[in-house]
From Swiss-Prot:
Domain of life: Bacteria
GO molecular function: acetate-CoA ligase activity; AMP binding; ATP binding; metal ion binding
Classification via HAMAP family: Ac_CoA_synth
Gene3D superfamilies found in the cross-reference section: 3.30.300.30, N-terminal domain of ligase-like
Organism: Mycobacterium bovis (strain ATCC BAA-935 / AF2122/97)
Keyword Aminoacyl-tRNA synthetase: no
UniProt protein name: Acetyl-coenzyme A synthetase
Chain residues that bind ATP: 387-389, 411-416, 508, 523, 534
Record keywords, A-Z: Acetylation, ATP-binding, Ligase, Magnesium, Metal-binding, Nucleotide-binding
One cellular-component annotation, GO: cytosol
Length: 651
């Protein structure tokens, strides 16, 4: 097994040149520690306020926060107008790449201002006013960003629904938000083919009695045929295209609602996470500048997330634009028309900062380094990871192969609910450890606690890993302001577990090492109890993926009469690895060696693919059903439900 455990570095300090020119310096930690509220006031004052705030934080009605009290601003003005007024109107705001090869658009900040103003005027003409809700059900096209900013400009809450979601998911979100307008497209491109989108929108609306939606604004994207409801349905290019490009933004209170974003509603009613204007944009702008070290004059930033997810909101729209950065948006899948697509885009636009998910990184690993190696990726100077804990093997591969062994890599931890990144290395300061999100950002306070809310001591060398609960013990500017229409659920979901301490419970397990670095281990639900030992699925998965033949792994705990739970692993092998009769036993032995004999999987199944949601998350719940020979639960959010035929055949 020696080939699976080569001598590798345990930490990676930033290159001297990067550290010398980094936006964030070590003094930030000291400033935030000395006076946290003054620190956040300083960050907020980087925005343009029509009316200055008079109080930084009002926590008198905890857990409902008010940040930058009394201040007024317009989010869209901060993302667009002020850059044009500062003389940067000719700077590219968005390089958009459609999935069909050759389909592209470029919008400067002046172009974006005109388009957002036209859309704002069009929405006003349709009778929308501040406080209304608009549902956006679009592929990742420029109109999606324009629609979001037009809503923000008018004080209207947008509720973006991922274009891969079903009619039922869209219906639930429209009903909960009582949306007055739905913005959609005739269709979208997926894996080289046009597929209908408005048809799902029509199905969703038809299933709603006394539907709140008055109009459906339709973007022509694919040209496919569709049903049309006269009087209700309107073409974007008619309504927005004919509107005036002149519009004066109105300031809104710092706590004015900005958007709703729903977390998965596959079981029960979806949770509408509500974010507001001043606090969200402050932390969004701050984290973009410090974590990603953006230089507006020279950087080209690419966050690969769809705008249907919070990562796409914060680091695909508001973060880059409020900092005046040039960004790339790509509509399609990473393997259309072939597996070179992402690397062609990096090369084409000279992307300097690339932010993606571990799922995609592991997919690239599975495809082999020959693909990225055939492209010039030298423009990249910083890499980022988001969405789930990244295992050390994938971390190193990402840095070595995509980053050429020279770029800093920021592994960011945050949630839909936190609004912005919370735990991450600062790239010009930290000696990053593969697999660790490192430390809370300046201005953020986090703890790892036990069942009683007491802080856990750092892990010591040779001792058993102790998994605790990741909690946030101080309010932060971009925190959610509640669950739409359900304050009791907000308290119960996030604050009830440690109510006596006043901690926000993130739902993730984590541990802290002797250097104070935080290792997020995934959802607490993904912690197994084997003979009284709590073992994280993430730790076992990391041990499996560290083997030279494994591309991806998913681990679940299954019922066992002797040990309470046993570990069952599903692994996808690398394309260039030749399996043999003892592959499964070899992997079981490796896990026992890396973690503990207690962590040795009872079963290892080699499968062709893992079941994933449309957002790329592995559905361990369904793998548990397979492992325990149960009927599959809800598969509505799966990207490809047929994957279970192959998994069962392999098992």
């Amino acid at each position: 097994m020696s080939e699976s455990t080569p001598e590798v570095s345990s930490s990676y300090p930033p290159p001297a040149h990067f550290a010398e020119h980094a936006n964030a310096r070590a003094e930030l930690y000291r400033e935030a520690e000395e006076d946290r509220l003054a620190f956040w006031a300083k960050q907020a004052n980087r925005l343009s306020w029509t009316t200055p705030f008079t109080e930084v934080l009002d926590w008198s009605e905890a857990p409902f926060a008010k940040w930058f009290v009394g201040g007024e601003l317009n989010v869209a003005y901060n993302c667009v107008d002020r850059h044009v007024e500062a003389g940067h109107g000719d700077r590219v705001a968005i390089h958009w790449e459609g999935e069909p090869v050759g389909d592209r658009r470029t919008l400067t900040y002046s172009d974006l201002l005109a388009e957002v103003s036209k859309a704002a005027n069009a929405l006003t003409d349709l009778g929308l006013v501040a406080g209304d809700r608009v549902a956006i059900y679009l592929p990742l096209i420029p109109e999606a960003v324009i629609a979001m900013l037009a809503c923000a400009r008018l004080g209207i809450m947008h509720s973006v629904v991922f274009g891969g979601f079903t009619a039922a998911a869209l219906q639930a979100r429209i009903v909960d938000a009582q949306a007055k307008l739905l913005i959609t497209a005739d269709g979208q491109f997926r894996r080289g083919k046009p597929s209908p989108l408005k048809a799902a929108a029509d199905e969703a609306l038809a299933a709603i009695p006394d539907c709140s939606v008055e109009h459906v604004l339709v973007v022509r994207r694919t040209g496919i045929e569709m049903a049309w409801s006269e009087g209700r349905d309107l073409w974007w290019h008619h309504v927005v295209g004919s509107a005036s490009p002149a519009h004066t933004p109105e300031p809104f209170d710092s706590e004015h609602p900005l958007f709703l974003l729903y977390t998965s509603g596959t079981t029960g009613k979806p949770k509408g996470i509500m974010h507001t204007s001043g606090g969200y944009l402050t932390q969004c702008c701050y984290t973009m500048r410090t974590i990603f070290d953006v230089k507006p004059d020279s950087d080209v930033f690419w966050c690969t997330a769809d705008i249907g997810w919070v990562t796409g909101h914060t680091y695909g729209v508001y973060g880059p634009l409020c900092n005046g950065v040039t960004e790339v948006l790509y509509e399609g899948t990473p393997d259309t028309p072939d597996r070179h697509r992402h690397f062609q885009i990096i090369e084409k636009y000279g992307v300097t900062i690339y932010y993606t998910a571990p799922t995609l990184i592991r997919m690239f690993m599975k495809w082999g380094r020959e693909i990225p190696d055939s492209h010039d990726l030298s423009s990249l100077r910083l890499l980022g990871s988001v969405g789930e804990p990244i295992n050390p093997e994938a971390w190193r591969w990402y840095r070595d192969v995509i980053g050429g062994g020279r770029t800093p890599l920021v592994d960011t931890w945050w949630q839909t609910e936190t609004g912005s990144a919370m735990i991450s290395p600062l790239p010009g300061i930290a000696a990053a450890k593969p697999g660790s999100a490192m430390t809370p950002l300046p201005g953020i306070s986090a703890k790892i606690v036990d069942d009683h809310g007491d802080p856990l001591p750092p892990h010591t060398e040779g001792a058993q890993h102790v998994t605790g609960y990741l909690v946030l013990d101080q309010p932060w500017p971009s925190m959610l302001r509640g669950i739409w229409g359900d304050p009791a659920r907000y308290w119960h979901s996030y604050w009830s577990k440690f109510s006596d301490k006043g901690y926000y419970f993130a739902g993730d397990g984590a541990r802290i090492d002797p250097d104070g670095a935080i290792w997020v281990l995934g959802r607490i639900d993904d912690v197994m109890n084997v003979s009284g030992h709590r073992i994280s699925t993430a730790e076992v998965e990391s041990a499996l993926v560290a083997h030279s033949g494994v591309a991806e792994a998913a681990v679940v705990g299954v019922t066992d009469e002797t040990t309470t739970q046993a570990i069952c692993a599903f692994v996808v092998l690398r394309a260039n690895y030749a399996p043999h009769d003892r592959t499964a036993e070899e992997l079981r032995t490796e896990v026992a060696r890396v973690i503990s004999p207690i962590a040795r999987p009872r079963d290892v199944h080699v499968v062709p693919e893992l079941p994933k949601t449309r957002s790329g998350k592995i559905m361990r719940r369904l793998l548990r059903d397979v492992a325990e020979n149960r009927e599959l639960g809800d598969t509505s959010t799966l990207l490809d439900p047929t994957v279970f035929d192959a998994i069962r055949a392999a098992k």
